[in-house]
Amino acid sequence: MFNSQAAVASKIIVALDVPNLEVAIATIHRLPQVQFWKVGLELFCASGPMILDVLKDQGKRIFLDLKLHDIPNTVAAAARAIAPYGVDFVTIHTATGLTGLKTAQAALGESATQLIGVTLLTSIGADTLQQELQIPLDPATYVECMANLAHQAGLAGIVCSPQEAARVKQRWGENFLRICPGIRPLGSATGDQARSLTPNAAFAAGASYLVIGRPILQAADPAAAFDDLCSSLV
């Protein structure tokens, strides 16, 4: 699937889902081979931009997963504030709507940061979507609708489950990124993920990047777990 472990590692985003800056720094040092880290709400709320400085000082790529979701003026202001951080990706909920997506994209200005639309959380399955949220669509159709908004707004790509990646790639092409969480290696517990696939299946389905957290960070030997994952995809 890939011609080297380094090529695989560049496409694996490890979720730095830890409670504070001290634990984050220890985790980063324990996994020097990881090139790309996801910083989510928990860690960003605990550490603020300091964690971004730590990662940039070590030459790491950063996926800032804040899932912006507010009125257009507010998401634009947030995007404008994020731009100087110099992260690679930042996320926004596509349910913000087309106007909000466009204004947030415009607010990034000349920044190299790419805006990524979150379509449907991978913890949400058909029952939750249709019965609790009262959206009368199956997850794949809903994701395609949200991906269409992101594409219209000029976003770089979307976050979707690996189960929808092929459909998105077929419609919008290779350059419209598909970043896929909900990845569970064989033998791993699915936990709270309702729409998941194995790493091999996810890349085969058309994922551009995989986001993997617990199967690596909660392993007895996280570094070995990451290396084994990369080896399995070469």
Curated annotation (Swiss-Prot):
Pathway: Pyrimidine metabolism; UMP biosynthesis via de novo pathway; UMP from orotate: step 2/2. Keywords: Decarboxylase, Lyase, Pyrimidine biosynthesis. GO terms for molecular function: orotidine-5'-phosphate decarboxylase activity. GO terms for cellular component: cytosol. It catalyses: orotidine 5'-phosphate + H(+) = UMP + CO2. HAMAP family: OMPdecase_type1_B. NCBIfam families: PRK00230.1 (NF001273), pyrF (TIGR01740). This is Orotidine 5'-phosphate decarboxylase. The lineage of its organism: Bacteria, Bacillati, Cyanobacteriota, Cyanophyceae, Acaryochloridales.
